[in-house]
Amino acid sequence: MTIVRKPQWLQKKINPAAHAGMEGLLGELRLHTVCQEARCPNITECFRERQATFLILGAACTRLCSFCNVTKQTPIPPDPGEPDRVAEAIRRLGLSHVVITSPTRDDLPDGGAGHYAETVAAIRSASPATTVELLIPDYLGNRESLARVVASAPAIIGHNVETVPRLYQIRAGADYGRSLGVLRTLRELDPVVRSKSGIMLGLGEAEEEVLAVFADLRSVGCSYLSIGQYLAPSKSHHPVREFIPPECFERYRAAALATGFAHVESGPYVRSSYHAARYDGQL
């Protein structure tokens, strides 16, 4: 297999020394972030600015997606004290906007939806001015779980399609149609919900496939979109097939906006929660 080398313009430096303050707070409160667990390349930038995407419901996932660095092992039961600790961290950090996500928890009857709702309620109590964005799994398409999340009334609810339908073998246990169904159901449950999705590029997708995903997302009422470059966390993960140049991301951004998205972030380092407050500014 040919190894695609990372171009010079995609070399982002990570400075662990800049993480100390945030890591101290997270350690004290026994919290996880997707920034750490997913080996996000933006971690230094975000931690330096005292921003973080909180990972609730533990750090172990019940699925085996070949692109993801989150641990694949038997998950622990939900921690009933976690919502309050997340809320305390947000209060101390003084966050105006926060993103909450989790591993997929197919082992739980509601997929963890109730824990999400409890976390939103705790944040509202501790930090009423903070707007909350949730990035949720598919809950196996369970409408009751989705209704529980919608009823918690976050500012934005995200669910990522991740890639084009042809490449869905990288998402073990997922289904493209089901993910579109999640976004459709969110809109059915709350016609004014602000929904969001994300797609990674560089996995071998064709441009026409990407544009078709944009159209599919708009057809189910998706409001916001993030487009970023896939970066393999390690050699054992799914390989990068192509590094997409910045000008292509700009072209995709223009195409997505033309289909009717209210806001689009598109660039090599864009991730679902990267610059998340920019989407919130569209509310």
Curated annotation (Swiss-Prot):
InterPro entries, A to Z: Aldolase_TIM, Elp3/MiaA/NifB-like_rSAM, Lipoyl_synth, rSAM
Pathway membership: Protein modification; protein lipoylation via endogenous pathway; protein N(6)-(lipoyl)lysine from octanoyl-[acyl-carrier-protein]: step 2/2
Entry EC number(s): 2.8.1.8
Key words, A-Z: 4Fe-4S, Cytoplasm, Iron, Iron-sulfur, Metal-binding, S-adenosyl-L-methionine, Transferase
Enzyme class: transferase
Boundaries of every Radical SAM core domain copy: 47-262
Residues involved in [4Fe-4S] cluster 1 binding: C35, C40, C46, S273
Catalytic activity: [[Fe-S] cluster scaffold protein carrying a second [4Fe-4S](2+) cluster] + N(6)-octanoyl-L-lysyl-[protein] + 2 oxidized [2Fe-2S]-[ferredoxin] + 2 S-adenosyl-L-methionine + 4 H(+) = [[Fe-S] cluster scaffold protein] + N(6)-[(R)-dihydrolipoyl]-L-lysyl-[protein] + 4 Fe(3+) + 2 hydrogen sulfide + 2 5'-deoxyadenosine + 2 L-methionine + 2 reduced [2Fe-2S]-[ferredoxin]
Entry keyword annotation includes Transmembrane: no
Full protein name: Lipoyl synthase
